[in-house]
Amino acid sequence: MGVELKFSDAQQKQENQIKAIRSLIAQKVDVIGVAPIVETGWVAVFQEAKDAGIPIIVVDRRAAVPPDFYVTLMGSDFVEEGRNAARIMAKWTDGRASIVELQGTNGSAPANDRYLGFREILKDSPGMKVIASEDGELTVAKGKEVMARFLKTHGKNITALYAHNDDMALGAIRAIEEYGLK
């Protein structure tokens, strides 16, 4: 069959992703798959791939480009994920919570959409308030760092945590344990 997979680790930087896509275009690959770090800033490089006749498959995260610039998007409904998180939290807290939020990468489709979905449900839950929200960079280390800061500022007033992914949640749990809470 002769399939060769080429991979580039962009280190969570859009400029590195754009360089990698341009390199793949120059190599005349058959198809490009990309999980955009952020939603915006993709039109030029996607146009370059389109002009070269190389289809792009967008994975996990949307890119703010015309729909004919890529062949498909394989991903989740992040707005619904945010809604579901808020519904579950409302159930477990009887609709009363002082929430801290660890968001995903600023400007990314998952972070933007989970934020919107979560807050959509909170509008109908007056006893649930987000008291602090910050980018946790989707990592254990940053999740722990931000949660430690939340705890220093808000302490035991925090009654719930909404983390946009499991790595940040794991970091937050470590910070919570070090703070002496369970």
Regions found by a protein language model. Name each.
Residues 1-182:
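A residue-level marker of the well-folded mature domains of exported/periplasmic proteins
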